[in-house]
From Swiss-Prot:
TM stretches of this protein: 20-40, 46-66, 100-120, 126-146
Sequence similarity: To M.jannaschii MJ0795.1 and MJ1249.1.
Native organism taxonomy: Archaea, Methanobacteriati, Methanobacteriota, Methanomada group, Methanococci
Record-level GO cellular component terms: plasma membrane
Topological relation to the membrane, as annotated: Multi-pass membrane protein
Intracellular or extracellular location(s): Cell membrane
Protein name (record): Uncharacterized protein MJ0785.1
Amino acid sequence: MENNKCGTMRGESVYLAYPFILGSVIFVEFFIFGLVYLTFGLGLKTIIITSGVILICLLPISIILIRLFIKSIAGKNKGKLIKKYTKLKILNKKYKILKVLLFIVGINFYLFGNLVSLNINPYTKFVLYSISAFFIIISIVVGDVIVEFYENGVFINPLGFYKWGEVGKEDLNDRLILKIDKLVIECKR
């Protein structure tokens, strides 16, 4: 059986950009169109179709903005790329529990919106559904990271940039177990 290599990095900072920006885009969109629905009395079908079209347009824009944001927080001389891991898994139990709890919260908001839909106005229903989408999206993307080893440090997208620690460049094999602050990440290629 292959022994996993283990290394420790000195973390500088942790960022969770993707979940909150993407979730916020969806939340704001439904919030605005909920107001439009109440103000101008547009049909629910029109609002849903228009929201979907605008969401499709907003996602690429938000991804571009996220990329720029990530570059700004990691705006350092990273040096040459040594190795990139794309199949990663955060082994901390609290992240697994967090994913499940966030998903349950999102489903609860969705079910609550369905159960009380006859007794509430459409605006409130939109708010409940947007909150549901926000939590479900966060539950899906929490722990979804990419690790890139550069000459001058390690960039964990979207968590941030870290300096080299005890892990050596010769240890960058498949199934590397990387410890950064309190995070434990299994790296696979």
